[in-house]
């Protein structure tokens, strides 16, 4: 058994992705670049919204979450701007490796669609242990728990963004631009999580970590 993160994708978004994949594999000559760029940006935003924004909205009574939500909106805006733009450069044949890579991350279960990525067992056990310490009232565990949470999220960024980006083999200028966007957005998110460590109490930290753990489960 392996541990993986399961992130829900809306059925209509998945249906659009599946349709584009079918068009590409059947050799349809009509360009799929714009449609694919839009659907991938929606997938990315759905993932970010369910992991972060829903959590922050549950804790709106804490003033710190307002600043967090602004950071997340910046990230969503960058995704909606740059992902469709980056995909638009390519003909259909160049899109197939990317679509096939991403299709392998999708998992259907009980009429629900998940985008998944694996997490090393050691990291999974560490964050679960850290969560238990927070639940037991260990205030000193807050910073470590949020750091581990950042590590789990970054594994997802690598598996779902950095690695599939390689499939497209961008030219130097575009690749450098996209790397800058990825680095900027992840830095914003990770710095915000780090800052939260000094602003929230143990109980709220436990809520944050436990919420994310709900996305992690065993995968056969």
Residues covered by each model-derived region:
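Protein-protein interaction and targeting regions used for scaffolding, dimerization, and localization
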Residues: 2-220
């Amino acid at each position: 058994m392996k541990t993986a993160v399961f992130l829900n994708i809306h059925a209509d978004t998945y249906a659009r992705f599946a349709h584009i994949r079918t068009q590409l594999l059947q050799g349809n000559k009509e360009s799929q670049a714009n449609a694919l760029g839009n659907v991938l940006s929606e997938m990315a935003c759905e993932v970010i919204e369910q992991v972060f924004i829903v959590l922050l909205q549950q804790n709106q009574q804490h003033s710190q979450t307002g600043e967090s939500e602004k950071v997340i909106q910046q990230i969503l805006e960058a995704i909606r701007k740059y992902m469709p733009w980056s995909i638009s450069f390519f003909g259909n044949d160049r899109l197939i490796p990317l679509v096939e890579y991403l299709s392998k991350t999708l998992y259907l279960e009980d009429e629900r669609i998940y985008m998944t990525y694996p997490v090393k067992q050691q990291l999974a056990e560490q964050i679960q242990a850290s969560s238990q310490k927070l639940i037991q009232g260990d205030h000193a565990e807050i910073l470590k728990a949020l750091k581990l949470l950042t590590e789990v999220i970054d594994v997802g960024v690598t598996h779902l963004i950095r690695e599939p980006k390689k499939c497209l083999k961008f030219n130097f200028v575009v690749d450098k631009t996209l790397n800058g966007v990825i680095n900027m957005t992840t830095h914003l998110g990770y710095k915000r999580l780090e800052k939260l460590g000094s602003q929230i109490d143990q109980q709220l930290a436990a809520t944050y970590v436990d919420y994310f753990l709900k996305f992690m489960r065993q995968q056969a």
